[in-house]
Amino acid sequence: MFEKAITRNTISLRKRVSVFLLAFISTLAFNIELYTSDPEEAYIHNRFFLFLYKLNSQLASSVSGKGSIIVAMTILFFFAFLYFFEIHPLIKIKGDTALSLFFSIMYAGGRGFAYNDSLSSLMIPRFNILKTIILVIGYGAFYLLLIRLLYTIMHTSKDISPKWPILHIYNKHPFFFVYIIILIMWSIHLIMRYPGAMSYDNWRQLAYYMGYDTYTTAQPIFHTWLFGTFIRFGLFIGSSNIGLFLFILFQSLLMAAVLAYTLLIMTSWHTPRWLRLLTLCIYCIAPYFAGYAAFPIKDYLFVVGLLLWTIEIISLLQKENKSWFLNKSETVLKDTSSTGNIPDLLHVFFWIIGAAFMILCRKNGIYIYILTSLFILILFLRHIRKSPREVLMSIIVLAIPVVLTSSIDTAITNHYNVIQDSPKEMFSLPFQQTARFVRDYGDEISDDDKEIISKVLDYDNLPELYSEMTADPVKTTYHAQNNRELYDYFSVWLKEFLQHPLCYIEATWNQNYYIFMPDMDNVVYNQDCYFGSATYQDIGFDKYIGFYIPSALEGASQTICSWYKMLNELPIIGRLNNVAFYIMLMFTVLLYLKHDFQKKNHEYLI
């Protein structure tokens, strides 16, 4: 205490004032809005005094009614910044200031898009330039504190030592103990949303599979086949509800198993108990896990595969020679606990299964796998020095998921005569940019360019079809007949980009701005099995399928979804259910890895 008192007294007044100003700016960043009202007419002719008058009036209106909150937050930030930046400074990490500024700039841009779907709101009216600077500096300081504080927490040796009697069961059966807990916690969600929550894509998949619509590759054909098979089984035994619920149960069992496996692996890595317990709580409570368990979308099984495969990548990188085919004398780095003694062949099996689900359930899965596998192959060649057999076996393992998934897709395609869909999904990004350009700068487009765009998209209706948050309305108008029309279109696309590059940046940023905004999300919870049924209502397909909610559960799905929305608004739990939180955490962890490993073992950054 005496040393800390001395440290406080040695902090200069200049530093204290600087910290106070930073705390005040951070407080303003949390409380200001981009809406700026016009001040009352004052009939001031002196430009300098008029500027000061408007500045004072607009600043006053920006913080009006928030005096008590601003005082409390400023005091809180002042002592937090003073303690962690000056009195007991946290560890500085190379690049942490740049990362925190990146986060704050992305957040400020997101605020602009949330306000009026444009970056112009950050500069117009001119007073908003000051607000933007406050947002960048204020949130930058806040993010810098969090980055350094989290690094300190992650590297502390302190841990919890619970003495709960039930832990003896966990110690004997760590995987099944966690697995059962997750399933028990999810069961209430599955029951209240029985038989499951549908979407427009799910109804299209069933229409493809049942022959009510052309079976195309617009949806992943394996997931369409798998989902349709469960529903057809339900119809066969007399209840489509049972078929849907069995599929929900199937994907929930898989996800819970993979999540339990992550905690098993974390134990073998000697991850602190508090972090494992926190992770388990997130798995059990956060709507991203519990809520989506009752939603049969393709992304769910994709995440199952991606997560399992990612675990195996990390496990592989921990091995000394980066190979599954070790000699008995070789060891696994840090992997000395009993839970880490998983046979290499089982790791290989998990690698194949995880990669297969990832590739089969989303079209971009194959690109993720191939790019990562090339990196892994380079590691093999660098570390495997002795046996050509190890090289050959490793290459075979890397190739199996590609061959397996290609064979499955080919078999389904041949059996159901699946038609190749147009490349509209691949071009959704440039299509969205073109639509925004037509909306904002349509008067600058020549007649020849209009004709070229019209051969690919519905040019006349693009301004009305353009939606800032989704490319679906625009890309569905794709109708190019040949590659020449596409080539001409992309020539126009490039020319328009050079004319107004900011327009293209805004189109892409506007569609995804929420991924760096921890206080905003675009999460949607489809409530029940009726959602999206209107897609094929005119041909009676919804009646043929016949999903229904039992009378005893009427209103249950709305109730549980309202619970999800309430959790999203809570200060801490809501952030754990926010996509921006996990994306920013990923960037932060990459920074930690780069710092900890410095010039060696950069393969962990994968």
Predicted regions: what is each one?
Residues 18-38, 101-113, 171-198, 399-411:
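Transmembrane signal-anchor helices characteristic of membrane glycosylation enzymes that use polyprenol
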Residues 193-206, 214-230, 237-242:
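Extracytoplasmic catalytic/substrate-binding loops of multi-pass membrane glycan-assembly enzymes
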Residues 249-270:
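Transmembrane-helix motifs of polytopic, lipid-linked glycan transferases
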Residues 291-301, 361:
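Short acidic/glycine- and proline-prone juxtamembrane loop motifs at membrane-interface regions
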Residues 415-550:
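Membrane-proximal stem/loop segments at transmembrane-domain junctions that anchor or position
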